[in-house]
Amino acid sequence: MRRTFVYRVLGVWELARAFSVVLLTIVSHYQAPVSWTGPHPDYFSMTVLWDGSWYRLIAEQGYPPALPIDAVTGTVQQNAWAFYPAFPEMSRLLMWVTGLGFPVVGSPLALLLGFAAAVAMGLLLRDRV
């Protein structure tokens, strides 16, 4: 019974991930050049947009030594400290072990962790769903 449930969760998760891969691949052809991707981004370039760019920065360079403060307003600017360290540290370790870059290491790691989270949530909530 439990194994069948995990397979069902895996099936739904795989469909959702396949949809997002197809969607990112399609929209990459329409993505305007930005500093994170440059012109003509591929799938892996698209995975480091949005929050992925912050995780990449942390994995490659670490956290900044101090919070960046806007000189005019005195407010804290956007920075890497808004993101938890577990994912970028795991990515950094895999980058070191494999010699591969963050987009190639981070994307499969996020998929694996997402699957583990989907199974855990499914097992925790299956009596309520």
Model regions: which residues?
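Start-transfer (signal-anchor) and selected internal transmembrane alpha helices
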Residues: 1-37
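Membrane-interfacial loop-to-transmembrane-helix junctions in polytopic alpha-helical membrane proteins
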Residues: 5, 102-105
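Alpha-helical transmembrane segments of multi-pass integral membrane proteins
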Residues: 12, 79-80, 106-111
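Alpha-helical elements of Rossmann-like donor-binding domains used by nucleotide-donor carbohydrate transfer enzymes
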Residues: 17, 54-57, 89, 120-124
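Transmembrane alpha-helical core positions of polytopic small-molecule transporters
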Residues: 17, 84, 114-115
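Juxtamembrane/transmembrane-helix boundary motifs at the membrane-water interface
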Residues: 24-43, 66-76, 97, 102
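Short hydrophobic/aromatic helix or loop-helix immediately within or flanking a transmembrane segment
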Residues: 46-99
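Transmembrane-helix motifs of polytopic, lipid-linked glycan transferases
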Residues: 92-96, 105-128
